[in-house]
């Protein structure tokens, strides 16, 4: 009888202690909420559940391994402090991973959670194009830095110092996506255990919004922050999306803090991403920023020659040279033109000649040869640099006016067939020597002034 009474008394004491500790935990939660604020408390600390206190060792539970590890690193010291303020006998606070639907089930489900993360991982990424490998990428002066940086990231098992993040930028169809796919394929084929997520900024935004609606935001955070390499294509599309930018910012920081690699692409440099928060633009420029410039004739010809070789067909080199010379907008359009010529030849049963290629692509060639006038260049450059169109003709030599004027002269020489005297005449009657000086000055600055180079590349795309 005495043993039974003692057992019953012991159970009552335990229940009383458990109840007291539950009250203490509720008080601590209030303090944590006040100390950290709504955002941190709601995202991380509100999901903690009190389990027990055995000999001064407090045990809490978290729903996932990721949340547990994050709290252990960032918030555990403050939790312990508050608990010791309430109960000096407490010597430690630990966290286990428990399904919150059954807080009495004290099991570590680390392996199960790892499996769930892996099973849900594939839907994070966009499909990879099997054609986009390093072997199929033609390297030339406009893209050699971007290629070398991408290759280095793929080959390294750790983030590259000075290249994290790797930020690739350039116009549409110049090879940014190709390089990002190539990084992923290289890692996959090398049997690396590194986990990769490649997706567009639009898909990142969609996944985030979906997670908010379904109240799975913690799973979203865990999945994206558990990868070894995160690659986000066309990041300019998060422009103006405040909540998406907030989550992208925190994901970026979390991965950098964990020494994980990021690869980001956009159609312009970080500093030119209008509608993107300054703190994000700053971080995008932390690592290596590599631009992919417009293709040269030699690069376009090399791309066509490689594609023809892969297709296993014979096309006269003069036809390839014709395409490379006349289709300058982007690689995607160039390859599309070649495919059209080859398809026509196969379906109709005729050989590929210079004349047949010219006929087949007549509409495309006309579009690529749209007339760019001197007046159009002057107007667009004036708008871009926020000066008056009359400043293009004036004799004023203020730097804020002279530099845009030189840029306009440079673009006039590059984008039109006008002679130097004709260009000079359209700029307030200046002589050809002034035009030559302006062109040389801009060519010199392009090599050293990345901001000016970006501006000119953007203006060129706007004018064509």
UniProtKB/Swiss-Prot annotation:
Subcellular location(s) per record: Cytoplasm
Transmembrane segments: none
Positions of the UniProt region annotated as Domain IV, binds dsDNA: 346-464
Family matches, as SMART domains: AAA, Bac_DnaA_C
UniProt-annotated stretches for the region Domain II: 90-126
GO molecular function, one term: DNA replication origin binding
UniProt-listed InterPro entries: AAA+_ATPase, Chromosome_initiator_DnaA, Chromosome_initiator_DnaA-like, Chromosome_initiator_DnaA_CS, DnaA_C, DnaA_dom, DnaA_N_dom, DnaA_N_sf
Keyword terms of this UniProt record: ATP-binding, Cytoplasm, DNA replication, DNA-binding, Lipid-binding, Nucleotide-binding
Segments for region (Domain III, AAA+ region): 127-345
GO biological process, one term: DNA replication initiation
Binding site for ATP: 173, 175-177
One GO CC annotation: plasma membrane
Superkingdom field: Bacteria
Residue segments, region Domain I, interacts with DnaA modulators: 1-90
UniProt xrefs under NCBIfam families: DnaA
Family: Belongs to the DnaA family.
Assembly description: Oligomerizes as a right-handed, spiral filament on DNA at oriC.
Free-text comment about domains: Domain I is involved in oligomerization and binding regulators, domain II is flexibile and of varying length in different bacteria, domain III forms the AAA+ region, while domain IV binds dsDNA.
Role this protein plays: Plays an essential role in the initiation and regulation of chromosomal replication. ATP-DnaA binds to the origin of replication (oriC) to initiate formation of the DNA replication initiation complex once per cell cycle. Binds the DnaA box (a 9 base pair repeat at the origin) and separates the double-stranded (ds)DNA. Forms a right-handed helical filament on oriC DNA; dsDNA binds to the exterior of the filament while single-stranded (ss)DNA is stabiized in the filament's interior.
Protein name, per record: Chromosomal replication initiator protein DnaA
